[in-house]
Structures are given as C-alpha cells and as structure tokens.
Amino acid sequence: MSKIIIPANYTPALNLYDTQRAIGTVKRLFADTLCATLNLYRVSAPLFLEASTGLNDDLNGVERKVTFDIKDSGTEAQVVQSLAKWKRQALKDYGFRVGKGLYCDMNAIRRDEELDNLHSVYVDQWDWEKIITVEDRNETYLKNVVRCIVSAVCATEMNLHAMFPQLQELPLHTPNVTFVTTQELEDKYPDLTPKERENAFVKENGTTFLMKIGAPLRSGKPHDGRAPDYDDWDVNGDLLFWNDPLQCSYELSSMGIRVSPESMDRQLTMAGCDDRRALPFHKAVLNGELPYSIGGGIGQSRLCMLLLGSAHIGEVQASVWDAATREACAKAGIPLL
C-alpha cells in the first residue's frame, strides 16, 4: 500500500498533451546542457547484467533484484538497479581519458521500493561518470561539479518557462547551493530523524548538497544507507531541492567521488561485505585497474516533477500503482500516466 499525499487545491500546470511535450523538452535540454558542462558523451546502457560480475548496484544491500535465467547461455541475469559500478568499468573499456566522461539513459526496476508521491518501482535517470585525477578527489572538486549540475537545472527551467508560459506561475530555482554534512545536520537537529532533518534544513536553506553519506555518525548510526563499493563516503552526497506542492525535501541526485582502492578496502570491511572482494569489479578497483572517477544518477522523472511543479511522480512517468493510489489521484484530479 502506497503512502500518498494529496496537496490541498493542487491543479497540474499543464494538460496531458503539453505535459508530454514538456517532458521531452526537459530530457533533451537538460541532457545537452549537462554534457556540455561536464564534457560527457552518450553511450548505450544495459537493461540487465550477468549476476556473477558484481556490476549491479546493491543499493542499501537489502533490496531484491529482478532476476531471470537466460536459456541459451545458461546464465543468471539481473535487471539493473543502477549503473554506478558498470559506468566506471565502461570508462576503461571504452577508452575514455581524464576530463572526459559518459552518460546514459538508465532504466531500472526496484521491486521493493515503497511507493509514494516521489517513489516508483520504475526508475529512469541520467547515469553519468567522468574520469578524474587522484588530485581531484577532494571536496572542492565535488562542490564544483554539484554547482554545474544545479546550473544546468536552472538553465533548463528558464528555457522551459519560455516555451510553456503556463509554468511561469511556478517559482524559479536559483543556482545557489548550500553545502552541509550529515554530521552537521545531526548536531543541528539531534532529536529529529534523518528525513526530518533534511526537511527542516532544506525548507530553511533551499537547494542543498548533503555530504558524507554512508558512514556511522557520532550517534552510532549512518544518516542513510550507501553501498560500500562505489561512492567514497567521505566525498559523496545527495542533491536536495524543496518540493513546494508536497512541502518536503526532494532528492534529485545521489552522487560522489568513487572509491579508491584504499577507501573500498576500508568500506567493505565496515559494511561487513568482505565477500565481495572476490567479484571481478571489486578486484579491479582493489588492484588499481580502474580509473579514478566521479559520477552519479540524476532522476529524469524527478527533474520533470520539479520543473513542472507536479505532485506525484506518476504524472510524468508510466508505472504500476496500487488501487488506492489510482483512486485517490483520480478523485483529486491528479492524472497518472
């Protein structure tokens, strides 16, 4: 059963026809702007991966993957949950050099996702990855990339408002970003849950990049789960916006500088995942065979939601919803695709 919120007096800014046009516009403009800003090139992405490679994303380590066998090859395949690890391997395999990177249109199925206004079992995002030097593995470099992404969001929004005057009633986002660590957030709001801390901070400060996600805080608990084998927990984070219709913090992107051999070694042990050391991808990282990189995923439907002022992700993507969600949205005049 999903947990749906119906905002009071909500009306979609665009009709269904214009919504489809706007979605296409957002996806085209943002991808072009992001590529130009970060020096990225589009590559084709897999829909599923062989299970034995270890390239699929384990997310928080408890989500079940969609798995099936392939008759002719006799192998087991998994529908991707994200391409965080695959992209880094692809940078090497495709011959990318320092300062250049790739992006792809990633489509995933997350069967254990808890459905609500922001979460669907269908995930569509721009997955991107870029080769950096070892000297670039620092907060300053990470913050500069975050600012580039936010600038691309704002540029896309400006063009969208020019093409669809109906959207000019919505507030424009600014390129300003506030940076804060998970420990600073816990210190500021010790009596709130992690999600409540995000809501309180982003409501007050606007667009925020929340840094250092994965390792335990002084309370003994991490702010949120993070797989130990792609992001370096010291130089990663979530890009958060304020969702005005839902009055909550809203994650557009999870990203970070990727693990070095040393940080993967440390994080695998911290997470109790030492068994992964035998997998091909993990061996390659631990042996220093893959390039240093930075990367992340940027939600396509989430960006469309943000820029169209939508109240439910089902307004901008076609997915499967429970009967209660469909009935509540129909009653409130929220059209699900």
Model-derived regions, located:
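A glycine-rich phosphate-binding loop feature that marks nucleotide/adenosyl-phosphate handling sites
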Residues: 47-51, 165-172, 323-326
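Extracellular structured ligand-interaction cores
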Residues: 100-102, 123-127, 205-207, 249
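Extended, charged alpha-beta segments that form solvent-exposed binding/catalytic grooves
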Residues: 104-192, 196
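A general structural signal for short secondary-structure junctions and capping/turn motifs
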Residues: 68-70, 92-98, 118-120, 169, ...
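Generic recognition of stable, solvent-exposed alpha-helical segments in well-folded globular domains
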Residues: 18-25, 29, 137-144, 148, ...
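Class II aminoacyl-tRNA synthetase-like tRNA-binding/catalytic domains
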Residues: 2-119, 127-131
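A translation/RNA-centric and nucleic-acid-associated enzymatic feature enriched
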Residues: 109, 180-337
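A generic secondary-structure signal for well-formed alpha-helical elements
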Residues: 30, 34-41, 149-160, 311
